[in-house]
Amino acid sequence: MPEVSLISDSEQETMAIAGRFAKNLKAGDIVFLEGELGAGKTVFAKGIARAMEVSARKVNSPTFILMNVYQGKLPLYHFDLYRLENPEELKTVQFDEYFYGQGISLVEWPERLGGLSPKEHWLVALSHKSEHQRNICISYPSNPQRKFSL
């Protein structure tokens, strides 16, 4: 199953899809969350957090601080790079220790990583289908044959 495309009709359904996807994740995994503003990246992150036994109410987008850390079944590192002007700024939060650590890294606006982007990562692309519907496409670009289930 190289790529899965789904349509979500609500935030609750997006969180449920993310929760099912989270069952495929293991320590050291990096998940890129791509999409325009309001596409559902943080909602998807909340669904993963809930599946990792982190209260979804605690999860918010770390736009102004670059990263939040949540403790659950595994540590969850949630990056929001929207305001990042230079990938070198990530060194101030020692991002590589998190990316290659014992938890799961969720990265909103991953295109801002520039040359620091890890080769191995999941890609979750979210886009607006309508006001309430979202297209969700999940893949593992560096190994399209990596199997996962939803």
Segments from the language model and where they lie:
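N-terminal pre-Walker A segment at the start of P-loop NTPase domains
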Residues: 1-18
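Short phosphate-coordinating micro-motif centered on Lys-Gly-acidic
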Residues: 2-4, 85-90, 96-150
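Phosphate-binding P-loop
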Residues: 22-27
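Hydrophobic anchor at the beta1->P-loop junction of P-loop NTPases
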Residues: 31-33
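P-loop (Walker A) phosphate-binding loop of NTP-binding proteins
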Residues: 36
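Conserved lysine of the Walker
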Residues: 41
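Short beta-strand-centered segment that lines the nucleotide-binding/catalytic pocket of NTP-utilizing
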Residues: 55-69
